[in-house]
Amino acid sequence: MRVLFWMFIGFDRHATSEHLLSAIIERLCEAGHSVHIIQKDTGGDLPIIPEKLSRYDVTTDVIPYQAADKGNFIARYLAELKYINNCKKFIASNYDAVFIQSNNLAGFAVKAIRNKLPKAIVTFNVQDIFPYNVVFSGTIRKNSVMFCVLAGIQRYGYKHSDHVITISEDMKDTLVADETEVDKVEVIYNWSYQDEPYENVDLAPVAHVFKKDYFNVVYAGNIGVMQNVDIIIEAAKLMKDDNDVWFHIIGNGVYREKLELRASEYGIKNISFWPMQPPELAPVIYSAADVNVIPLIKDVYKTALPSKTATCLACQKPIIFAIGMDSKFGQKCMKEAGCSVVESDHPDELVEAIHKILNGEKDEKAGKFFRKYCGITENSGKSAEIITS
């Protein structure tokens, strides 16, 4: 089959989803399909076709893209709409199947495909569910005129896709409740960078970050409103007299400066803020931690799941999900991977979970869970099969 792979990032710059997308392309090529990529030119200096894909039958069109200010919701939406319009002339009429990367303009993207390729198999990937995610962040109100319009555009995209791939049972429930046909929604967990859990990781590259004589509590990733890193600051406040515990916030984002200021106002001494690290260091950071914390604001588990989750599981260190006890994914990780789950807005519960792990209460089954549910070859292969079926 000829597969059109429509991305809403560019390979010219590192992104959290690049290893997911490149793995799917690799599986498609290994299965004998040819792949043409439409992607953004974001001005980065990385190869537009990653080295590991260069040996396959992969071609690409690169579309100039001017990013909007991350804090300007409307400008960002319009920038994405402009990107879709600029891509239309590159959508040829000879593709058998189309994969569309997760984006906030599903209806516009799918309609552009259907206009050119009415008989193609269309698969839409949902990594987060817009506009419900921005409702939870407080950007817009549910059932407002804006929400209804934006939600209607997304529903159109899901309705006119043949397959919808999402990344958790919680998110599937949200899609189905929002009128997506249950039979077209497939759950495939995101994966890490390899099939096997990480063993004997060389921690030297982050030796300057972590303190050997402390219990290191780690958050690494984007620092925005949705990530709810606030709960870690509040937990650190409650534990600022714990002389054997050190908190590490690793990453950048629009909310970081506010959190640094709050930590200073609280007089928290046992906390460090570090800049975002290269993606290849993610397994090293998570392996060096004594516990990794994965937080989200209240109810966001219904619309998103942090992409780092699989890599954290692969590193086989204790994990605390501060996402809410009602999460199906959280409950599954608690039962099958031995992870802890606490509410998003209860820092006292996070403190209690940290103390339990500090005191040796661990149930280390994360590696087994990772092998069972998060293998890169199997899960990217499942995605490739759906795209071409």
What is each model feature region?
Residues 85-88, 108, 112-116, 144-166:
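Membrane-proximal helix-turn-helix segments that form the acceptor-binding/catalytic region
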Residues 8, 12, 65-73, 120-152, ...:
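Acceptor-binding helix/loop patch of EC 2.4 sugar-transfer enzymes
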Residues 41, 170, 188-191:
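Carbohydrate-associated surface elements
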Residues 203-204, 345-352, 358-387:
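A charged, aromatic-enriched C-terminal amphipathic alpha-helix characteristic of glycosyltransferases
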Residues 227, 278-285, 292-313, 319-331:
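Nucleotide-sugar-dependent
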Residues 80-84, 97-119, 123-133, 342:
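An aromatic- and histidine-rich active-site surface loop
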Residues 248-250, 257-281:
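Nucleotide-activated donor-binding/catalytic signature segment of Leloir-type glycosyltransferases, i.e.
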Residues 1-56, 241:
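N-terminal subdomain of nucleotide-sugar transferases
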